[in-house]
Amino acid sequence: WYSKETPNSSVGNFGIIINAKADLIREKFFWKNAANTNLSWTKLDDKDDDTDSEDFEVATDIFNLSSLYGYNLTKNFAASAFAEYRSSLINNFNDPGFLDLGVGATWTPFSDLVVVIHPLNYNFVFSSSGNSYESSLGAKIVADYKKEIGNLNIGSNLSVFLSYQDTDYSNYTWTNNLSYTIWKNLGLG
C-alpha cells in the first residue's frame, strides 16, 4: 500500500472521447475514414496549499484523422493509399502536427483486423515552435482491430512510421479503448 503524495486533496476529472467513421465497401474497392478525438481535463485541489491552481488542466489532447483507399487484388489483399493526420486541438494545434501520405498494400485477414503496410510513405512534420522536427521518407505500418461483443466495444490501433533517413525521425502511436454502449450510440468508455 502506498499513501498518496498529497494526502489532504481531492481530484476531479472530465473527459470527452469522440470516435467517428465512414466506410464505403464495394466488391472491387474500399474507402475507410476515421476521426478520433480524446480530450480530458483534471483538477487537483490540495487543501494544504492555498497557491494551487483553481483551474482544470489539460490532461489528454489527441486529434487524429485517417483515410484509407484500397483496390482489392484478392479477398484479403489490396493495393492501397493512406493518409493520416495527428496533432492536438487544445494546446499547440499543429505544433507539432504529423501528416503521413503513402502507398503500399492492405491486408484484412478477417473483418475485425486491418493491417496497412506502406513501404513508400512520406511523414510531413509541422512545427512553429523552436523544437526541431524533421520530415522524412519511410515506411508506414498500421494495425487496426475493432470488436463488438454485445454492447462491449474493444479497439486497438497501432500506427508506426519508420524513417529511412534516421531512426530519430521515426514515431508511433498506440491507442486502446474499451467502451460499453448504453443506448444507441451513447456509451461509457
Q: Which positions does each model-derived feature cover?
A:
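Transmembrane beta-strands of outer-membrane beta-barrel pores
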Residues: 1, 26-28, 37-43, 83-89, ...
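Residues that define the transmembrane beta-barrel architecture of outer-membrane proteins
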Residues: 10-16, 59-63, 95-101, 131-139, ...
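Residues on the lipid-exposed face of transmembrane beta-strands in outer-membrane beta-barrel proteins
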Residues: 16-24, 67-71, 85, 103-107, ...
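Repeated loop/turn-to-beta-strand initiation elements of outer-membrane beta-barrel proteins
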Residues: 28-31, 76-79, 111-115, 146-155, ...
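Hydrophobic/aromatic-rich structural module bridging two neighboring secondary-structure elements via a short loop
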Residues: 43-100
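Detector for outer-membrane/organellar transmembrane beta-barrel domains
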Residues: 98, 102-163
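Outer membrane beta-barrel transmembrane domains
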Residues: 135, 148-189
